[in-house]
Amino acid sequence: MKGRTVLEVGADGVAIITITNPPLNLLSVDVMLSLKESVEEALPRENVKAIVVTGSGGKFSGGFDVSVFGGSDGRKENRKVGFMSIEFLTDVLEASSKPIVAAIGGPALGGGFEVALVCHARISTSTAQLGLPELQFGLIPGLGGTQRLPRLVGLTKALEMMLMSTPVTGQDAHILGLVDSVAPTDELVNTARSWALQILERRRPWVTSLHRTDKLEPLAVARAILKVTRRQAQKQAPNLRHQLICIDVIEEGIISGPRIGLLKEAEALEELRQSEITRSLVHIFFARRGTSKIPGITDLGLPPRKVNRIAVVGGGLMGSGIATALIVSDYHVVLKEVNESSLLDGIGRVKVNLESQVKRGKMTQEKIERTLSRLNGVLSYDSFKDVDLVIEAVAENLCLKQQIFADIEKYCPQHSIFACNTSAFDLNAIGERTKSQNRIIGAHFFCPAYVTPLLEIVRTERTSPQVIVDLLDVGKRIKKTPVVVGNCTGFAIGRMFFPYSQSAMLLVERGADVYRVDHAITKFGMPLGPFRVVDRVGFEVAIATSNHYVKAYPERAFKPMLISVLQEENRAGESTRKGFYLYDDNGKASPDPDIQKYVEKAQSTSDVTLMKLSDGDIVEMIFFPIVNEACRILAEGVAVKASDLDIASVLGMEFPAYRGGIIFWANSIGSTYICSKLKDWSMTHGDFFKPCAYLVERAAKGASLVRHLNCFCSVLHVEQMEKPLLVFDMLLLELGGGTGLYTPYVFGH
Ligand SMILES: C[C@H](O)CC(=O)SCCNC(=O)CCNC(=O)[C@H](O)C(C)(C)COP(=O)(O)OP(=O)(O)OC[C@H]1O[C@@H](n2cnc3c(N)ncnc32)[C@H](O)[C@@H]1OP(=O)(O)O
């Protein structure tokens, strides 16, 4: 049984029904049936005058357990569609002859919130979280939320809460009229009890949300709002249907009446819950939470040490972004620069970052000064004597980084963590001039560091588990999703992303059209096609990165001619307003009619046969090499879990979350198909496409690409091992086939 409700009747005649499924009191069919039983038991009892519904442990309910959605449950419900929403919640609970009040602490989300909306009044704590975030799973609210929320807060606010999946606090819910009264946690249930009795005595209104109309906009206005919202949703997410379905269901209720709306809602949910999109988004939900669970590290029981003061070395784009992320989350930061003017520039960038947060509504103007007071600019290492963590974020120059690490070792206390924000260099090389290898770790932030939610944490074979646990904790406090990876050129995210532009160049040099490639890829769901990405990054950086990868992975790197040809024409990307695209004063990109001329020049440098490709071919030829690289990363143990790469691809590359991340998507296509395509292309176009051993092995078995590293934590490079090829037995636990097969693995590059 997955949870239940508990019924207790007090001497005052109020029955308390407590949803009990800790820790979040998630709903399940069992909980709902138990709630129904408790309500049906309480209603006819003579000693019950009113009912309060609440959740155990001060948490109302986090909503339905989403692991049952997306077809993973297998349990088929035989009940009629709408049974819970209409026959129970509406016809029994909402229509009850005794007042029912919800007492809400903690989360009241999704189905949990919908139960509360059915009640005749809601009392909450000020910090409770109330909302309908079902759309984040490709679902729509299924227990009446689409009908009741607009009737309680008006259409505009309801649409915002549902389509953005953003909850409101109890305090804000009170202002919106969603909550009738706010009470302190320890008085919550008693306040709800007396409210319920007051409703009975007609001293408080007895409201059935479904029948309210006072907050609903007039029909013509409502229709206009829905039309605009529908258009926006179509524009923002052309590959997704569930937002449009949600809007249709709301409209149906407004035009044909809420009961018809309820039925339409239940039918739509039934269809959506089995969709591939829901399956993918549910996977992303759990995968994201899973990134901070590192076998052999976070299961050691090491509590994170308290990090109070952090030093950031370098106030450039990355350093100032990192400092911003830290001070916004209440850390005290020392920002070190080499001279007065660079320091002023760095602090200036932090201010600009904070102001941009004000413009985006993420911070108030008044908070800027207080936040900035946590930033202390310095020119020497003297104030590093009490820092717990240093994050080095200077330019990608190995000698400079080595010198900084040697310097900070002299000034910092013994316990300080030394983190490096490199996206490229081997951390062992960076720490070569120190004796502190066990406290060196990579903290790879993504630009802009104070916005992008991803933090790639890079460990070497010598980084201590305590240091990893500490950085995970800092990451959590600054609201980043960490992905812990091993040490190698490009780490996991850079390596996975590298083939994105490489394949695109290869395709164009073999006959594809630049803009057709970008169009096919954005249609697939990427926000920017590969050529727009190269323009944004800038040709100089793109070439430097490319050289780095070509050096590290020569056997599979493609050396494009196209960028060099464009560079000869003084094009350098978006910053010069001329790259693959032309850019206007506002940075708006438009195709360049001259581009084909340069493409033909690049094509003429080799004697390849030009291809004709469909959009589907383009998508496969761009993404299968990424899948291939992801497989290498998994096989080498650079990533611990396939789902970590899914999150890395979604947060680091903006791969569409509704496709579940790179490996999840690849599995939906099948390893055999992907491998056979790569094999074919490698015959014609060379080793860039050659499938790696891991992919070939999985494809031969028709197996999933999911494999979890069991417990070994470090990635060893063969060239760094004293006795190469001796003893590195990496136990790989195969979860995909569920056979528990252990395979010895030796790797290197
Ligand atoms: C018919 C209905 O309309 C359909 C629905 O109700 S769909 C569900 C709607 N509910 C939601 O979207 C809520 C999703 N959950 C959340 O936003 C957050 O978990 C929360 C705000 C409730 C709590 O946050 P927080 O305290 O930080 O805990 P968090 O780490 O996220 O979750 C704790 C555990 O519960 C799990 N969990 C949370 N919500 C869950 C859910 N709805 N289903 C399944 N598991 C859930 C998490 O995976 C995590 O598991 P773990 O400990 O094994 O890693």
Q: Predicted regions: what is each one?
A:
Residues 1-54, 91:
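Conserved CoA-thioester-binding segment of acyl-CoA-metabolizing enzymes
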Residues 3-5, 10, 20, 32, ...:
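N-terminal glycine-rich phosphate-binding loop for ADP-containing cofactors
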Residues 15, 311-313, 733:
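Conserved beta-strand elements of the Class I
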Residues 90-102:
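Conserved catalytic cysteine-centered active-site region
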Residues 102, 106-112:
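Gly/Ser-rich catalytic serine loop of serine hydrolases
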Residues 728-731, 745:
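Intrinsic disorder
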Residues 730-738:
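Conserved class I S-adenosyl-L-methionine
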